[in-house]
A protein has these predicted regions:
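General small-molecule cofactor/ligand-binding pocket signal
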Residues: 22, 99-101, 192-195
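Conserved Class I SAM-dependent methyltransferase catalytic core
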Residues: 148-198, 205
C-alpha cells in the first residue's frame, strides 16, 4: 500500500518484518526508550495489549512483529500524531491487529472499560516540572513533560484497565524511581522486574524498565543492566537486532 507523505514527514524502515513507520522530519521520532520497552515487555500468545500515550505507534508496531499478541490498542491524545500513527498501521496492513484511538490517558478506563487488557505498556512523559516551557501545547512538550497527564494518571488508568494478574511495562527515568514504585503499589500494581539502562558501561543509568503485576505478591527481581553503547556511535550486541532510533525524542 502506498501512503502519501505530508509536509515534514518521512518513512523509516523498522528493520523488522518489513515494517515501516511514518515520522516527523522536525524531531518527533521514536527513541531508544521505546525500542528498549518493546524488548522488555513480555506478551504471550492470544493476549490483548494497550499502549498508553502511543505517539507514533512505535510500540504496538514493534510488539506486533515480535510477539503473538492477539490485538494491540494504542491511545494518543494528540489528534495529528494519532492520525499519523493510524496511517502507519494502514501502511503495514495491520488494521485488524492494531487500533489507534484518539483520546486522553485520564479517560482510558472509560474508553476501554475496566479489566479489558492482559498487558499495558507505557512510555510516559518523564518530567514533572513544566517550568520554562514556552508553549505547553507543543508536540514535544506534551511527550516529554507532564502537561496533560501525570505519572499517577498513567498508573491509575493502567491499573484499572488491566485484568487481575495483568502486567504493566513502563520505561521512565531513574530519578523518579521511588515515586514510580510507590505509585504502582498505591494502585495495587506490584513491581516484579526492574532493569536499569546505562548509555555506557562507566556511566550512570539514564533509564529504568519496570514490570508490575496487578495484585501480584511482594517480590521483585532486579535484572542485569542494559548497556546501550560499546563506544560512541556503536551499539552493544544486544541492540544490533533492534530498530535504530533517529533521535532521542520520546514517542
Amino acid at each position: 500500500m502506498t501512503i502519501e507523505l505530508k509536509e515534514n514527514e518521512r518513512l523509516d524502515d523498522l528493520q523488522r518484518n518489513g515494517l515501516q513507520i511514518i515520522q516527523k522530519t522536525d524531531g518527533f521520532c521514536f527513541g531508544m526508550d521505546a525500542v528498549l520497552l518493546s524488548g522488555f515487555a513480555a506478551v504471550k500468545p492470544g493476549e490483548r495489549v494497550l499502549d498508553l500515550g502511543t505517539g507514533t505507534g512505535i510500540i504496538p508496531l514493534l510488539l506486533s512483529a515480535k510477539t503473538e499478541g492477539e490485538h494491540f490498542s494504542a491511545l494518543e491524545i494528540q489528534d495529528e500524531i494519532a492520525r499519523m500513527a493510524e496511517r502507519s498501521v494502514k501502511l503495514n496492513h495491520l488494521e485488524n491487529k492494531i487500533e489507534i484511538v484518539h483520546g486522553d490517558i485520564k479517560e482510558a478506563s472509560r474508553i476501554f472499560g475496566a479489566a479489558s487488557f492482559d498487558v499495558v505498556t507505557t512510555n510516559p512523559p518523564y518530567m514533572n516540572d513544566s517550568h520554562g516551557l514556552k508553549n505547553p501545547t507543543e508536540v514535544k512538550a506534551i511527550s516529554r513533560h507532564e502537561v496533560l497527564c501525570t505519572l499517577e494518571d498513567v498508573v491509575r488508568e493502567g491499573a484499572k484497565v488491566l485484568k487481575p494478574g495483568g502486567r504493566m511495562y513502563m520505561v521512565h527515568r531513574p530519578h523518579r524511581l521511588i515515586e514510580i514504585l510507590g505509585t504502582m503499589k498505591q494502585y495495587k500494581l506490584e513491581p516484579k522486574r526492574m532493569k536499569l539502562v546505562h548509555p555506557f558501561r562507566d556511566k550512570d543509568a539514564n533509564m529504568v524498565l519496570i514490570e508490575a503485576v496487578r495484585g501480584g505478591g511482594a517480590w521483585m527481581k532486579v535484572e542485569a543492566p542494559v548497556i546501550v553503547y560499546k563506544e560512541p556511535g556503536v551499539y552493544t550486541c544486544l541492540l544490533y537486532t533492534s530498530p535504530s532510533p533517529r533521535d532521542s525524542t520520546s514517542s
